């Protein structure tokens, strides 16, 4: 470990310890300080276990908790961020809370909720094995800017990523990312079968209306919600993806 990384870990651990002694939350502040003094602070940690990241506009916290519960039920030691500190600073603080004085993180899996815009930042410095991408909606525009800009940011990261990518086949903005890296053979899709609340009538939404490859208006067999549903492009054939995992008989009553 370099002297700079050693200082980063020791200083960070002292901050966490001090905050705990004062009865204060160490959720985000230590990571914010470390990012200020060392932009490569995540590289100071030694994480030898697989990292699973969950991202998307909606549902990150729930899916992260589901996956963590599944792994823990199998007897695995899990480190996760159930309270949603999902920015680079929050993830840095999480690792500080769980590492030893040499920056070593001991677990069977890290399951990390991660803000979409921070995926490239965090996982250019941590060795990610699996990225789960749920959806893209416009309800975070005030924070992340135009949704297409955000999608392209994630796409650029995926162009060189060769780990597992788990994508929502029912969201055209997510499904398109399965083609970001033609050399990655670890692309997997999931889907939710039509449920009782689905409709044949389109929602008034901007995202997911046109094919991302040929700009033709997409045809939907049905809409689950907003632009999420069974879709295909009548011109280039994008869509109608056969998922590896499909959730059936969804009962929301």
Model-flagged regions — what are they?
Residues 2-191, 198-213:
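Phosphate-binding loop of NTP-binding sites
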Residues 188-253:
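Adenine nucleotide phosphate-binding catalytic loops in nucleotide-utilizing enzymes
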């Amino acid at each position: 470990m370099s002297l700079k990384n050693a200082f980063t870990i020791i200083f960070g651990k002292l901050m966490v310890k001090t905050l705990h002694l004062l009865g204060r939350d160490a959720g985000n502040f230590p990571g914010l300080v470390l990012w200020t003094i060392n932009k490569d602070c995540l590289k100071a940690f030694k994480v030898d276990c697989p990292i699973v990241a969950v991202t998307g506009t909606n549902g990150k916290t729930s899916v992260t908790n589901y996956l963590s519960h599944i792994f823990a039920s199998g007897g695995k030691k899990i480190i996760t961020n159930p309270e949603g500190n999902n920015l680079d600073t929050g993830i840095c603080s999480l690792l500080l809370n769980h590492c030893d004085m040499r920056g070593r993180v001991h677990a069977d899996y890290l399951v990390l909720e991660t803000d979409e815009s921070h995926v490239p930042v965090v996982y250019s410095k941590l060795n990610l094995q699996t990225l789960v991408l749920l959806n893209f909606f416009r309800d975070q525009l005030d924070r992340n800017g135009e949704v297409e800009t955000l999608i392209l940011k994630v796409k650029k990261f995926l162009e060189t990523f060769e780990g597992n990518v788990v994508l929502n086949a029912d969201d055209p903005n997510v499904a398109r990312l399965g083609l970001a890296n033609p050399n990655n053979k670890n692309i997997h899709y999931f889907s939710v079968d039509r449920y009782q609340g689905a409709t044949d009538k389109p929602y008034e939404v901007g995202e997911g209306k046109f094919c991302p490859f040929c700009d033709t208006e997409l045809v939907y067999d049905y809409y689950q919600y907003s632009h999420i549903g069974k879709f295909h492009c009548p011109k280039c054939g994008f869509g109608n993806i056969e998922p590896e995992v499909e959730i059936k008989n969804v009962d929301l009553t």
